């Protein structure tokens, strides 16, 4: 009887352990990580000029985590590239409601607003980007501020942003020497 019990244990034990592993794997699945991976795939497809596959991945990202700012930021970028300005604007606003501490998000929204000739709102977003915690792309924002101010013919803001860009990244600021 003991021999049968040991043999039965030897046969059943692997199944019990594999069931535990399977259970753990399912529980460890992180919806936000899956959403982020889908957004990254979508951005890659956009770079390859494949908006259909980009949208499919963004929709799947939304299914994984509809409350993740990065999904809505990705959708905003998608709509922006497709020329769907109202949808892009809405998605930027949703992303900011979900997480307004992301400097890259403020910077991207500022760039979007500048392209829509909403210069004052764009400058506000750039300023919010610069004031965001743990934001390390100041040179990008100063460059965008300068370009936007130049487009709006706001030369005082342009000069201020350019000066900050020189202090942050002098090589990047050099390309503005052709602007007069």
Q: What role is predicted for each listed range?
A:
Residues 61, 94-95, 128-131, 164-165:
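Canonical positions in the second alpha-helix
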Residues 34-35, 69-70, 103-104, 137-139, ...:
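Helix-start (N-cap) detector for alpha-helical repeat units in TPR-like alpha-solenoids
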Residues 14-36:
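Bacterial Sec signal peptide processing site at the extreme N-terminus
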